[in-house]
Amino acid sequence: MRFTFSNDLGTLFTIILAIGFIINLVLAFIIIFLERNRRTASSTWAWLFVLFVLPLIGFILYLFFGRTVSARKLNKNNGNVLTDFDGLLKQQIESFDKGNYGTDNKQVQKHHDLVRMLLMDQDGFLTENNKVDHFIDGNDLYDQVLKDIKNAKEYIHLEYYTFALDGLGKRILHALEEKLKQGLEVKILYDDVGSKNVKMANFDHFKSLGGEVEAFFASKLPLLNFRMNNRNHRKIIVIDGQLGYVGGFNIGDEYLGLGKLGYWRDTHLRIQGDAVDALQLRFILDWNSQAHRPQFEYDVKYFPKKNGPLGNSPIQIAASGPASDWHQIEYGYTKMIMSAKKSVYLQSPYFIPDNSYINAIKIAAKSGVDVHLMIPCKPDHPLVYWATFSNASDLLSSGVKIYTYENGFIHSKMCLIDDEIVSVGTANMDFRSFELNFEVNAFVYDENLAKDLRVAYEHDITKSKQLTKESYANRPLSVKFKESLAKLVSPIL
């Protein structure tokens, strides 16, 4: 009896392995042939490695983290929202191709090729009537956000990766509910994974007052989200079509420095002016993509005439996501780095880009450009941290100055060149932000803002340690092992 049981068990195990092997062969075929235009070579090899080293587990991981997104499904509900902006983009492209840049701004004229490239995206139209303020502290940011919510007159739209309903989240939700009582339109779009501790039931009172709330790529089954790999990492607020926010801060007490990582250093922009139209457009397209309610159509109230001359900061909003082969933000960063003549200042909590991005940084440094990169000194995601540390260290031999921020956790996503142009937003300098997640950045052609953020960066350096070739060479063997493991799977982190 025992012998029969053993044989049966062995047969069952063999069948399971055979099924797993067949499934992996099918997935390998899909990854190599059917998804070849949606993946980099390094990503393809990394997934093949996972599938064949971990046959059954690899299949499960692929279901959650390996599937790609259909652009057709995402864009099917756009309606007539894009009509006016398609015309504006076409007009600006034609003007730039003729050498007519439509502005006296020196930075736009000097970097017209960057502007022209960013015009290739539906959000990328150039606006000039803008006033920009920046925030590097979460308390200062959300004090201002709450004031702006209180002063809203017609509507408030929020789109966030993380909307934690802790102290800060409850304060913001209460402020929004007060505006609902005054008859305003209020919509919240949060990411289902980034806000994993939030339930739709938490918004029952908000919805009873007339508020609308949706979860991006919401899971249809408890604890099972097969779109876990493609998250909406954007952070956008639009108020009355006049005022917008974009940057790295999520909503939650952690971002006020009250979490386990300590002080939270990030960068966020408050924009008044015509660039708010691009943030509004992005919110509407993302809202419509979820298709669970009546869709937005074009309405002049969402794109109103702005309240007079506000400033002279030219801005382009760049969005990127897995449904497009054109990685707008990555290419924008890369173009900036390759255009730099004097200096490049980079900040990113995760630094796992592809070789072309790393080579652009090396080329800039070896061309005599003063290149700085700042990363965290502590991990919030261990494997990601060690891949970041390894990639950053690879730049040392090219003359790049590497800093680890010691005063808490740095979450800022910033690229700044020559004290002339700065990009701030949600996109980390990694494969996930460049290709897998939905991201949004502002590219600002404003010397004053660029210089202010460079001064803030230099202050950050005083709270950082500079990584040297010597200190990196003397790292412990355990660190070398972690780096090697992390780098092996970094294309799918």
From Swiss-Prot:
Gene3D superfamilies: Endonuclease Chain A. GO terms for biological process: cardiolipin biosynthetic process. Pfam families: PLDc_2, PLDc_N. PROSITE patterns: PLD. Its EC number is 2.7.8.-. GO terms for molecular function: cardiolipin synthase activity. The active site is at H233, K235, D240, H411, K413, D418. GO terms for cellular component: plasma membrane. SMART domains: PLDc. The keyword Cytoplasm does not apply. It comes from the Bacteria. Keywords: Cell membrane, Lipid biosynthesis, Lipid metabolism, Membrane, Phospholipid biosynthesis, Phospholipid metabolism, Repeat, Transferase, Transmembrane, Transmembrane helix. The chain crosses the membrane at residues 13-33, 45-65. It catalyses: 2 a 1,2-diacyl-sn-glycero-3-phospho-(1'-sn-glycerol) = a cardiolipin + glycerol. Belongs to the phospholipase D family. Cardiolipin synthase subfamily. This is Cardiolipin synthase 1. It comes from Staphylococcus aureus (strain COL). The gene is cls1.
